[in-house]
Swiss-Prot record:
Keywords: Repeat, Secreted, Signal. It is found in: Secreted. It comes from the Eukaryota. GO terms for cellular component: actin cytoskeleton; cytoplasm; extracellular region. PANTHER family: GELSOLIN, VILLIN. Pfam families: Gelsolin. Expressed by the venom gland (posterior main gland) (at protein level). GO terms for biological process: actin filament severing; actin polymerization or depolymerization; barbed-end actin filament capping. This is Actin depolymerising venom protein gelsolin 1. Residues 1-26 form the signal peptide. InterPro entries: ADF-H/Gelsolin-like_dom_sf, Gelsolin-like_dom, Villin/Gelsolin. GO terms for molecular function: actin filament binding; phosphatidylinositol-4,5-bisphosphate binding. Gene3D superfamilies: Severin.
Length: 377
């Protein structure tokens, strides 16, 4: 989905635009975003040659696959009139250009700053939208061919998605990771999820642990509800399944048979050690006068390593990329952290479904805290 982003010239253009706006209006935000988020509802902008162009309400829910969009959801506190909370989504079509996706990310930071740095930011990928995003459009999300910078390309928006196979494994922290779509990836010591694009199958290894089985079932239902929008079914393939049901699983997988499945798997604790070793924390700072990204090699990771004056990027490999925004960080640091997060998705060969989450200083979710030793709230 993401290509290497050539954001040097892009960032320059955007920051210059911010400077000009600041000089003429006193506001560090694009003119088309001024006044956004002051009433309940949603507002949408389509990125056109580095500019956020408002989308007519009659077109809400329709997204061109060749473009990028910013969607702002505003909710008013029922008990305190005039007090709002916000969610900012930047939606990326499967054929969007690198300039458009980069502009959407940068303008999202601008909008976040304009709203007091309190909004929650979400990255949405065409075909992998979150349930929260889809619920914004009662009539559903519709994909339209083409885009501002792309030619017309006909696509079947109802076509089944690509098949994917996931391994569910772990002792203390259960992880879900995509593996090769092959019977050779299976073993009886773990659980696996086969997403055919229309149906979801859970292979329960006879020697797998109960937490792995529970996690696999939960993840499979999330794939059905979020990725398939509630369509299709979840099938469990375990020791109680009939030979016909097992055969159906391998037919959907495309190869193999039960006799080819290995009985043993890598030790869960050793597996977790390897996964933890791949986790990397980067600091993005301009304290020296220059914008520098530094890899922090100290392990284990500690909460004290996160400084409010800077931004950080945590690449967990299996659980996605987290961009941590220090409450006192500069706009340049925020933009660079976003750029690095997006670059890691490509450079580290993450699947397109991998999530990149923006984490607010002081509002860290449990999934993020798990990577740090003795986190204190």
């Amino acid at each position: 989905m993401f290509r290497q982003m050539k954001l040097g010239s892009l960032a320059t253009k955007l920051l210059l635009a911010c400077f000009l706006v600041t000089c003429t209006s006193g506001l560090d935000i694009h003119p088309n975003l001024i006044g956004a988020g002051q009433k309940e509802g949603i507002e949408i902008w389509r990125i056109e040659t580095f500019v956020p162009v408002p989308v007519p309400k009659s077109e809400y829910g329709k997204f061109h696959e060749g473009d990028s969009y910013i969607v702002l959801s505003t909710k008013e506190d029922k008990s305190k009139k005039g007090i709002f909370t916000w969610d900012i989504y930047y939606w990326l079509g499967k054929s969007t250009t690198q300039d458009e996706s980069g502009t959407a990310a940068v303008l999202t930071v601008e909008l976040d700053d304009a709203l007091g740095k309190t909004p929650v930011q979400h990255r949405e990928i065409q075909g992998q939208e979150s349930e929260q995003f889809v619920k914004l459009f009662p009539g559903g999300v519709k994909y339209l061919p083409g885009g501002i910078d792309s030619g017309f390309k006909h696509t079947d928006t109802n076509a089944p998605g690509q098949k994917k196979l996931y391994q569910v494994k772990g002792a203390k922290y259960i992880r879900v990771r995509q593996v090769e779509l092959s019977a050779k990836s299976l073993n009886n010591g773990d659980c696996f999820i086969l997403d055919t694009g229309s149906e979801v199958y859970v292979w329960v290894g006879k020697n797998s642990q109960l937490p792995e089985r529970l996690k696999a079932t939960k993840a499979a239902n999330q794939i059905k509800e979020l990725d398939h929008r509630g369509r299709g079914k979840v099938f469990i393939v375990d020791a109680s399944s009939t030979s016909r049901e097992v055969k159906e699983f391998f037919t959907k997988l495309g190869s193999g048979s039960p006799s080819e499945v290995a009985n043993t798997s890598e030790d869960d604790q050793e597996y977790e050690k390897k996964q933890d070793a791949m986790v990397t924390l980067y600091k993005v700072s301009d304290a020296s006068g220059k914008l520098v990204t530094e890899k922090l090699s100290e392990k284990p990771l500690k909460q004290s390593m996160l400084k409010s004056e800077d931004c950080f990027v945590l690449d967990t490999v299996t659980s996605g990329v987290f961009v941590w925004i220090g409450r006192n960080s500069s706009i340049q640091e925020k933009i660079e952290a976003f750029k690095k997060g997006l670059a890691f998705l490509k450079d580290n060969k993450h699947p397109t479904w991998t999530q990149m989450q923006r984490i607010v200083d002081g509002g860290e979710p449990t999934a993020f805290k798990e990577y740090f030793l003795s986190w204190k709230n």
